[in-house]
Amino acid sequence: MFCYQCQETAGCTGCTRAGVCGKSARTAALQDLLVYVTRGLCQLTTALRNQGEAIIPEDDRLVTENLFVTITNANFDDDALQARIRATLERNAALRSRLDGAWLSAAARWDGSGDWDDKAQAVGVLSTADEDIRSLRELITYGLKGMAAYNHHVNAYGKSA
C-alpha cells in the first residue's frame, strides 16, 4: 500500500501499511487498479474519437465516476470497487474490439486476467521508479480526480460539464 492523497498522511510522507483515514491496503490496491483500467478506457475512447467514431455518454460518465470514487475517503467499499473494475474491463473489451489493438497501452489491453492483487502492485503509485515522472503522473491524476468530483456534482443536478 502507498497513499499520499490527503493531509492526514502519516508524517507527511504517505501511508504504507494502512491509511490514517482507515483505508486498508486492499482498498488502496483496488483504487490503484481502478485508476489503471480507467486509464485504459480513456485511451480506447480517445482512439475511437480520433477515428471519427462516436462514444456514448455512458463511457464519459464511467470515467468520471471511477475517478470520483477513488478520491480521498469517498469509497472504501471493496465490493463496489471490484464491480467498477469489472464493468470497466467489460467496456474496455467492447471498445477494444472496434480497434486494431497492436499499438494500445498495457492498460487498454489488460483483460482482467491474472491475480488482481499482483496486478495492482505492478501498476500502483510506486510502480513508477522515476520520482519525477511518478510525481508528475500523480499530480495530473489528482487534478483529474478533482475535475471528476466537480463533474459528478454537476451530473447530480442533471447537468453535464
Give the ranges of each region predicted by the language model.
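Metallocofactor- and cofactor-centric catalytic cores in central/energy metabolism, strongly enriched
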Residues: 1-161
